[in-house]
Amino acid sequence: MLPEQFCVRMKEMLGEEYAAFYASYDLPKYQALRINPLKTERDTFLLQAPFSLNRVPWTTNGYYYSGNDQPGRHPYHEAGVYYIQEPSAMAPAEYLMAEPGERILDLCAAPGGKSTQIACSMQGEGLIVCNEIHPARAKILSENIERMGVCNALVTNETPQKLSDNFREYFDRILVDAPCSGEGMFRKNEDACDEWSPENVENCAARQAEILDCAAEMLKPGGRLVYSTCTFAPTENEGSISRFLERHPEFELLPAEKKDGMMPGVPAWTDHPAEGLEHTIRLWPHHLKGEGHYLAVLQKAGVLSRTCQGYCRNGVEKGISEKECKEFFAFAEENLVKNITGNFLKFGDQLYRMPEGMPSIRNLKVLRPGLHLGTLKKNRFEPSHALALALRPDQVKHVCSLESDSPQVKAYLNGQTLNMDGEKGWYLVTVDGYSIGWGKLAGGILKNHYPKGLRKNG
């Protein structure tokens, strides 16, 4: 049951369109996945996908799937071949237009759909900082970064204010997918209905202002800022943007192409509308196949320069010498076709390869400072699950190849050992050629190293 005050407001906003908007809540929700180009070519996946797929028109790799399909239960999901994501939510990252080699911030990043979408555009080059203020959600974010094979992410659990104190005019692009009243989630999540109130809308708008002000400080001159919400409330959309532009005249709204059913923002829905509000975008559930979203593309005055370093409070993270992680290099020589190079960082006995030019993480709450390589133990190295998911079969010397419909895949994901012949040592386990985890072979038995917390029962 939709909140009465919400319905009254939407009727005032939409007029003759309200009936179609209201009727959209009786339709089945649209479900989609986004193919991960860090793991597979789109055309390759479409040929082998065991699902009925239809293109999401506003994103390169997004596809609707049938309600009868269950891609979340397929081994490809565990291998990070795709990310299950609400179709409307795929739009904001497209408009960020991320490029390889840039510094990018996803300021409110959990659960990770938009971060991993941005990372795909970066192709492993540059730095993406993925931040989430809530610890439990930050953990989920970090797990999704791992599953999708992202190597150049710094995952933090900080307030926007703390980040803005550390980074001034540092990022080329910033996405603010702001916490909101979640009106676009009503069909998907009944709790969103129960938690809604006009007071919550106002509280969200106030919080959005604080977040946007922090983002403004962290963006380089000439940089791009994309703001998005999954709500319909003008106070949180056209209103939040108009008030932001009043406070920050150094920003302007950029025209953004409206694709396949997208509609413009409406200046009349807010007091003192900013110039160019019609350039912002609304995704309505009665105009397209999605739950609904709002987004605005803004640019900061100035000329964007990759050579502009910006301000980073504690400089660049120094890392450690190769001598301090000699166990890893011994493992790599024995098991990898080509050594992994870069700058390395130790967290206790955990070893990471940092993204190039990663800033100092001193005084920051960090969950993942780059690619987790594994654990340094006395005279040996144990590779991480993240490393398995970041590697391709042609990058390792030993592979255990399984087919997605085989009982061995189910057994492996359940944590069981597998019988196989071969040289003893570490094996990258794959499903239809996609990396899914590690096993260690000795005496014809492949010991299972799939993480206990991810294992499927039954």
What is the predicted function of each stretch?
Residues R34-M90:
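Conserved AdoMet
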Residues N131-E169:
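S-adenosyl-L-methionine
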Residues A136, R173-D213, C230-N237, P264-W269:
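Mobile active-site "lid"/loop adjacent to the S-adenosyl-L-methionine
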Residues F171, R224-Y227, F232-Y352, G357:
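Class I S-adenosyl-L-methionine
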